[in-house]
Amino acid sequence: YRDHRALLFFSTRRSSDLFAECAAPPCVIWLQGDLGAGKTLFARAFIHALGYDGYVKSPSYGLLETYRAGGIQVLHLDLYRIEDPEELEFLAIRDLFDDATVLLVEWPDRGGSLLPAADLVLQFFEQDETRRIRCEAVSSTGAALAARTA
């Protein structure tokens, strides 16, 4: 990991562990922020907090990684490298996403209307040399998740 401070922060119960405990599929979580803001680190810690013991790799080149943890399927999607939202059709996201799935999406703005709507939007940013996450619930599912993590 490049930034141990971020890994420690995102591994605390105030962030990824807490969200993972409260996440109930189906759920779509958009991860927004600049390059290096901690989106992938958060996703790794989130997936491990669900109980996945293996290596969680960045989906930057393959676009999509799939994990099964605690009876939940987690799809981790990174759209940074796509040039056209139509490229998502080749991944068959709609076919993979079901009632037992949590979908984590980095760079969701690049997915256009082909992505499932977000339940929760996490905005990663730095303030006063500290990494922070702003949480916005955009559905009733997201509001319930945000309420359980408060």
Language-model features, listed with the residues they occupy:
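Short, small-residue-biased leader/transition segments that mark boundaries at the very start
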Residues: 1-4, 8-15
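Pre-Walker A adenine-sensing motif
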Residues: 16-22
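Hydrophobic anchor at the beta1->P-loop junction of P-loop NTPases
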Residues: 29-31
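P-loop (Walker A) phosphate-binding loop of NTP-binding proteins
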Residues: 34
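Conserved lysine of the Walker
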Residues: 39
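Short phosphate-coordinating micro-motif centered on Lys-Gly-acidic
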Residues: 48, 83, 88, 94-150
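Short beta-strand-centered segment that lines the nucleotide-binding/catalytic pocket of NTP-utilizing
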Residues: 52-67
